Curated annotation (Swiss-Prot):
Protein name: UPF0756 membrane protein LBA0919
Family stated for the protein in its record: Belongs to the UPF0756 family.
Keyword Cell membrane found: yes
Membrane-spanning residues: 4-24, 52-72, 78-98, 115-135
Keyword terms of this UniProt record: Cell membrane, Membrane, Transmembrane, Transmembrane helix
Lineage: Bacteria, Bacillati, Bacillota, Bacilli, Lactobacillales
Recorded topology in the membrane: Multi-pass membrane protein
Coiled-coil intervals: none
Family matches, as Pfam families: DUF441
Organism of provenance: Lactobacillus acidophilus (strain ATCC 700396 / NCK56 / N2 / NCFM)
InterPro entries per record: UPF0756_TM (IPR007382)
């Protein structure tokens, strides 16, 4: 019963914040809880869901390469600008930090509660986005904007 109340509270907050991603995610999880056979699915989704999400985001990021919007000349140009190097370093930093984050979640599962709360606050109150790889882009945006750099 407590999990239903917790999910309902998250849904209300998402609705008040008009955050469609969180609304859909919460509704899907609540739907899963209603279905009798999903007891076996939930641990699998919990264990592999982040990787699935990263894969979907990676596919979306690679689409401009597939459509020809981004080519080798763009890659080479990246190495010629400070903003490009910042983007590369931000990507490396996020990948390395994520490795430590995954290890911490495995060692200290209680961190998940704080992360969920922080993510909900960030998404709803500050119009943030609950996505991992996009963090590198956000870090890049911050530094590029602070130093008025361009690609």
């Amino acid at each position: 019963m407590e999990s239903w109340l917790f999910l309902a509270l998250i849904l209300v907050v998402a609705l008040l914040g008009k955050n469609m991603s969180l609304i859909i995610a919460t509704a899907v999880v609540m739907l899963f809880k209603l279905l009798p056979f999903t007891g076996k699915w939930l641990p699998t989704i919990q264990a592999k869901g982040i990787n699935w999400g990263v894969t979907i985001i990676s596919v979306a990021i690679l689409i401009p390469i597939a459509t020809g919007q981004i080519g080798f000349k763009d890659l080479i140009r990246t190495f010629k600008t400070p903003a490009g190097w910042i983007a590369i370093l931000a990507g490396i930093a996020v990948a390395v930090l994520s490795r430590y984050g995954v290890n911490q979640l495995a060692a200290v599962p209680q961190v998940t509660v704080a992360l969920v709360l922080g993510t909900i606050i960030g998404v709803v109150a500050f119009k943030g986005v609950a996505a991992g790889p996009v963090i590198a882009s956000g870090m890049t945006y911050l530094v590029v904007t602070l130093f008025n750099l361009h690609f």
